[in-house]
C-alpha cells in the first residue's frame, strides 16, 4: 500500500478525494490537513463521522513528507505552489488540483499572479488523462486540469484536424453550484441560485486561455476561444456545448468513436448528453452533430469528480504504477 494524504480536506474536492481514498485498494490514507488548523473530519464533513478516524492537522510540509509518499493538494489557486515545491524536494509525489501548475508561465502570470516555483512548473504534467497518460507514468508532479477545460477539451480535441481553426470557437458551459466551492457568497446563496440561471465572467473567464493553450499544445493550432460559463440550480454536474466550423465533411460520432476507441471512461452517446448520467462518476459523456459546416459538440461530466478529484486519482494511479481505473467511481447517482 502506498501512503497518501490530502491537504485541503475541508473543501468539496477534498471531500471527494477522502471518500475515494478510504476504499482504494492500493492507497492508504495516512494524512489529512487544512491550512486553517487542527480539527476533526466530522467537524468539516458530518457525513464522514464514524467512517474516517484520522485527525485533521494544520498543513505542514515536514509532517506531510513524514507521513506520505504521494499527496493531493486540494488548495486554492496561489496556495499550492509553496507546498508543492517543498514536498517535491523531499521526494513526495504531488497531484495538484489548483491552477498553479497547469499553465505555461506567461499564461499563468497573465491571469493569476507571479509564479513562485518556475522550476517545477516546467516539470509538471497536465493530467488530462486521455492525452497525457504515458507522461503521467513518469511524473513527480501532476497538474489537474480545470473542470470546464476538461469537458471542453475532451469534446473538441478529436475535431481540431477537421475544423477551421481560423474561425472562432464558441464554448457555452453550465455548472452546478458546487463548482463555485464551499465558501459562502451572494452568488451561490440559495435564494440567488434557486429557479435561476445566469452567466458569469462572460468572455473573461480564466479557463478560456487554458482551453486555447492546450488545443495548441496537442494540435499546434492557435484558436480564438470565446468561453461563457453559467451557474445552474444543481448541486453537481457540468454540461459544455462547443460550436465550431467544419472545413470538411465528416461523421462526427464516427470521429469520436475512432478517437476514443481505447478510452474506457469516455462514452460516446447517440443522443444529446445530460449531467445526471455522469453524476457521481469518472465518466465523460460526449455527443456531436453537424449541419453543413456547423459542428456541435456537447460533453457532460461530474464537475467535482472527472472535473477535479477522480481525474486527480486517475493521475495518481498512473504515477504509482497502478491501473488507471483503480478505485474510480463508475456508478452514477440515479435517480
Swiss-Prot record:
**Which GO terms of type biological process are on file?**
L-arginine biosynthetic process
The reaction(s) this protein catalyses:
N-acetyl-L-glutamate 5-semialdehyde + phosphate + NADP(+) = N-acetyl-L-glutamyl 5-phosphate + NADPH + H(+)
Key words of the record: Amino-acid biosynthesis, Arginine biosynthesis, Cytoplasm, NADP, Oxidoreductase
Metabolic or biological pathway: Amino-acid biosynthesis; L-arginine biosynthesis; N(2)-acetyl-L-ornithine from L-glutamate: step 3/4
SUPFAM superfamilies to which the protein is assigned, alphabetical: Glyceraldehyde-3-phosphate dehydrogenase-like, C-terminal domain, NAD(P)-binding Rossmann-fold domains
Q: Name the major location.
A: cytoplasm
Give the InterPro entries listed for this entry: AGPR_AS, AGPR_type-1, NAD(P)-bd_dom_sf, NAGSA_dehydrogenase, Semialdehyde_DH_NAD-bd
Q: Which GO terms describe its molecular function?
A: N-acetyl-gamma-glutamyl-phosphate reductase activity; NAD binding; NADP+ binding
Q: Catalytic center at which residues? A: 147
What CDD domains does the entry give? AGPR_1_C, AGPR_1_N
> What PROSITE patterns does the record tag this protein with?
ARGC
Q: Where in the cell is it found?
A: Cytoplasm
Q: Which domain of life is it from?
A: Bacteria
Q: Which GO terms describe its cellular component?
A: cytoplasm
Task: Tell me the protein's name.
Answer: N-acetyl-gamma-glutamyl-phosphate reductase
Organism, scientific name: Sulfurovum sp. (strain NBC37-1)
Gene that encodes the chain: argC
Amino acid at each position: 500500500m502506498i501512503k497518501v494524504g490530502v491537504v485541503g480536506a475541508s473543501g468539496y474536492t477534498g471531500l471527494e478525494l477522502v471518500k475515494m481514498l478510504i476504499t482504494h485498494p492500493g492507497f492508504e490514507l495516512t494524512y489529512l490537513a487544512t491550512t486553517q488548523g487542527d480539527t476533526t473530519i466530522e467537524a468539516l464533513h458530518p457525513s464522514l463521522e464514524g467512517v474516517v478516524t484520522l485527525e485533521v492537522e494544520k498543513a505542514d510540509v515536514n509532517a506531510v513528507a513524514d507521513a506520505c509518499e504521494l499527496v493531493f493538494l486540494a488548495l486554492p489557486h496561489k496556495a499550492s505552489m509553496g507546498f508543492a515545491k517543498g514536498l517535491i524536494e523531499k521526494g513526495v509525489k504531488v497531484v495538484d488540483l489548483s491552477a498553479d501548475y497547469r499553465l505555461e508561465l506567461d499564461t499563468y502570470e497573465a491571469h493569476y499572479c507571479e509564479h513562485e516555483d518556475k522550476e517545477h512548473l516546467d516539470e509538471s504534467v497536465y493530467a488530462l488523462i486521455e492525452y497525457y497518460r504515458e507522461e503521467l507514468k513518469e511524473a513527480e508532479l501532476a497538474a489537474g486540469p480545470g473542470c470546464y477545460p476538461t469537458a471542453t477539451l475532451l469534446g473538441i480535441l478529436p475535431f481540431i484536424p477537421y475544423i477551421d481553426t481560423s474561425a472562432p470557437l464558441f464554448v457555452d458551459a453550465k455548472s452546478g453550484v458546487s463548482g463555485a466551492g464551499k465558501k459562502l457568497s451572494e452568488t451561490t446563496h440559495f435564494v440567488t441560485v434557486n429557479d435561476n440561471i445566469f452567466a458569469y465572467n462572460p468572455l473573461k473567464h480564466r479557463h478560456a486561455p487554458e482551453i486555447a493553450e492546450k488545443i495548441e499544445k496537442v494540435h499546434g493550432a492557435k484558436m480564438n476561444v470565446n468561453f461563457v460559463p453559467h451557474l445552474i440550480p444543481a448541486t453537481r454536474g457540468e454540461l459544455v456545448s462547443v460550436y465550431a466550423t467544419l472545413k470538411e465533411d465528416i461523421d462526427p460520432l464516427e470521429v469520436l468513436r475512432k478517437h476514443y476507441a481505447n478510452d474506457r471512461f469516455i462514452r460516446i452517446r447517440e443522443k444529446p448528453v445530460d449531467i445526471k448520467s455522469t453524476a457521481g462518476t469518472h465518466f465523460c459523456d460526449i455527443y456531436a452533430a453537424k449541419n453543413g459546416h456547423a459542428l456541435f459538440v456537447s460533453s457532460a461530466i461530474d464537475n467535482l469528480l472527472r472535473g477535479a478529484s477522480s481525474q486527480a486519482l486517475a493521475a495518481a494511479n498512473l504515477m504509482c504504477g497502478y491501473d488507471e481505473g483503480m478505485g474510480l467511481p463508475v456508478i452514477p447517482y440515479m435517480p
